[in-house]
Structure formats: structure tokens, C-alpha cells
Amino acid sequence: MAKEQVQAITKMEEDFAQWYTDIVKKAELVDYSSVKGCMILRPYGYALWENMQKVMDEKLKATGHENVYMPMFIPESLLQKEKDHVEGFAPEVAWVTHGGDEKLAERLCIRPTSETLFCEHFSKIVQSYNDLPKLYNQWCSVVRWEKTTRPFLRTTEFLWQEGHTIHETAEESQAETLNILNLYASFCEDYLAIPVIKGQKTEKEKFAGAKATYTIESLMHDGKALQTGTSHNFGTNFSEAFDIKFLDRNGKWQYVHQTSWGVSARMIGGLIMVHSDNNGLVMPPKVAPVQVVIVPIAQHKEGVLAKATELQEHIQKVARVKIDASNKTPGWKFNEYEMKGIPIRLEVGPKDIEKNQVVLVRRDTKEKEFIAMEQLEERIPALLEEIHNSLFNKAKVFRDENTYSVTKFEEMKKVADEKQGFIKAMWCGELACEEKLKEEVGVSSRCMPFEQEHLANECICCGKEAKQMVYWGKAY
């Protein structure tokens, strides 16, 4: 039996990176593949991605977006059409040079992102303003040859959705860019229980080839920031490079206004690092593959499994539920489902059946309560909502307690050295100051938040007139 015990994980206070790796492995989300930086998404991990995908897909379709699929391969000549774009991705591109034994006439890039393919397609199908807008989304995997990798957070191949839209006017494309950012923010907060900060990236941090990049940023348990999703307004940068024109309402040729936006399985990494603890994964209920697990106690005794099955039939009307009727001990099962982060555990044994009750245990707080069996259908949905709110509020309190406002350079340096979290400081808008803060303080600009605060008149770095408040931090 000793070999069957669920192994303990490294404590996050001792080694956060190892704690994270232990969770993704021991909660059976992923396994490593034989290709460096690639991961195998196991059934439990993929079910989590599917739940996230389902919600996002419904939200996108409800706002008029259509799913398409583009090829995996991009000809080198096509990738090079937008200069800033290709320079931004060149170091990470994987190339196909041979088909069988034959050398290809032109190298093919395995898509790191699909802007160029969408642009080529749009240039063929758009003639007039009547053809606009086009609101496309793609679910796929992309490849970026990363030097340092970690499951979900930074992998050579990763799953994502990428949206690509074209519009008649600059106002429409800007509205689309911000609407999608808001959709991402509400998904993070309302489904993953992760509080986010919405804002714009600086020129240095924006997407290669974009006119403007908007982001949602979250704070992880180790005080580092995670860019959880981005939405880009391209203006006419790509449409000019790819000659995507339409006849406007006055019979004149115009370039389309374009957007691009995406979120990836990196959100799963965020979910782990925001909510989980030293006992394993803590799953936000709304996306959890299993929301309730029933553990029969003394299941060999008459009536126990039958009662557990009866409870499952009632609960499955209101939640995703499973019974573990394996021959493992109850203690092993408790540890296993704690590690996997299932929000609610129900225990039912002979004594509970006599009293017409079950023992209910919350994963997030470990609180136990006795619930009458007939109340479960009503109690469980309410409790799942309660758990979601509790996780969100706990994460928000943590973020707020680890966000610091500074007005002097030395003060910023001290906070960055001694604390972990977001640092709010004023900035003049100059690249030189942004680079100096990266070099001397060790922080990057996370975003210029939409909700601005006036902390001082001067830039934290050079003392010149400040233009905006910026969130700074160490990041994944």
C-alpha cells in the first residue's frame, strides 16, 4: 500500500518553480514529451482546456465571430511581407526545409501566429464595404522555439485561439479591440476567478507590427505578473503590406482596419499559480472538469454503493460529478482529489445513510459540514458559486496587498529588491527610462492601466514631466 500513497509536493515557500512543476505533474494535467519544451496534455488537463474553450467559443459566436482554420505552414516570402512582424518573431520560428528527401524551393515556417495567412486570404475575398466586417477566430496550436520552457506558461508548441478581424473604419476596429479585451477580462474574472488589470502596452512591449496592444495582467502567488491575454489594433499596418483594399461608400479604394487577439493554455498556468496551495491544485468550479467527487466509505457494506450512485444521479442534474468506487483506501482518495483540486468532496458511509446525510468537504478552505441528502441539489450550485467568489476575493486581496505605489527611483529599487508584486509609478513615456528601469531595477512595464492614478508630477526615472501611471513588475 505504501507505493499507492499520493506523494507530497514541494512547498511553494521553499521552491515556487518546483511547487508548480509538482502540481502539473501530480495532478495529472501534463506529462513531458521527448521533444524539449513540448508537453502531453493528459485527459484531466485537456478536459480543463475544453471547458475553457467551450465558454470562450460560445462568447465569441454570440458576438458574431466565426471559426475558421488556416494551414500550419507559412511560406517564408509571405512571412516577410510585414517587416516589424517578421523581425519580432524571427528568433522563435521553426522552419521546414525538406519534404521527404527533397529540399523545398522555399522554406516553410511552422506558424508562430497566423496574421500573414489571414491577410493573404482577406486580400482575395474583400472587394467592397459590403464584404465587411469579417470576424474570424481560429482554435489551433502554434510553435515558438523558446529557450526556457515550463508547462502551460512557455512551451515550444501551445494551444490557443487567435482572432483576426477586418473593418471598414478605424473606430470599428478600435471598438472590436477593446470589446475583445473586455471579453477576456470577464472570462478571467467570472470563470477562472482571476482578477485582472486592463491596460495598454508601451511601444516597447506591444505586438510586432501592431498600432496598439492592450492587455490583461494578473498577479501570481510568487509576486510575478502574468500577461493573461492580449488584443491588438493593427490599424492599416498589415492591410497596406498585404494590399487588403475595399471600395468604400464613395467609390474610393481604402485599406481595411484590422485587429488580432488571443488567449492560450497559458491561462491554465495562471489558474494554478493564483489559486493552488501546498496540498495541490485548487480548481475554480466553473471550469473544473469534475466539480463534485463522491467517495463511498466502507463501500463493501450493503447499500453504500447503491446510495452513492443514487446521489450521483441527483447531483449530475446540477454539477459535473463522479464516484470513485475503486479499491483504494478512503484516505488515498481524499489525498488524490485534494491534489487534483476538485471543489467539493462528498463522503457517504453506513452511518451517514442511517442519518440521511453526507459529509461535504470544500477543497479551497478544507471546511467540513453535514448536509441532508435531499438538500444537495439545491446546496451544491450555491456552494460552487460561493467557492468561486471566495477564490476571486482571496486573489484580489492578495494582489492589492502586494501592489505598491512609489514616487522616487531609490524607493522603487528598494521595493523591487525586498518585495514581490506590482509597482505603480509615474512615467514620462520615454524608451530610455523604460530600459533603465528594466536594467537597474529589474522590472518591465506591464501596462498603462485604463484606470489612471496621479501619483506624482515627475517620471520615476528621469524627473521630467510624467505622462501616465504604469504598472511595473517582474513577469513570466
UniProtKB/Swiss-Prot annotation:
Source species: Bacillus cereus (strain ATCC 10987 / NRS 248)
HAMAP family: Pro_tRNA_synth_type3
Complex and partners: Homodimer.
Domain of life: Bacteria
Name this polypeptide is given: Proline--tRNA ligase 2
Comment field on protein domains: Consists of three domains: the N-terminal catalytic domain, the anticodon-binding domain and the C-terminal extension.
Role played: Catalyzes the attachment of proline to tRNA(Pro) in a two-step reaction: proline is first activated by ATP to form Pro-AMP and then transferred to the acceptor end of tRNA(Pro).
Reaction catalysis annotation: tRNA(Pro) + L-proline + ATP = L-prolyl-tRNA(Pro) + AMP + diphosphate
Top class in the EC scheme: ligase
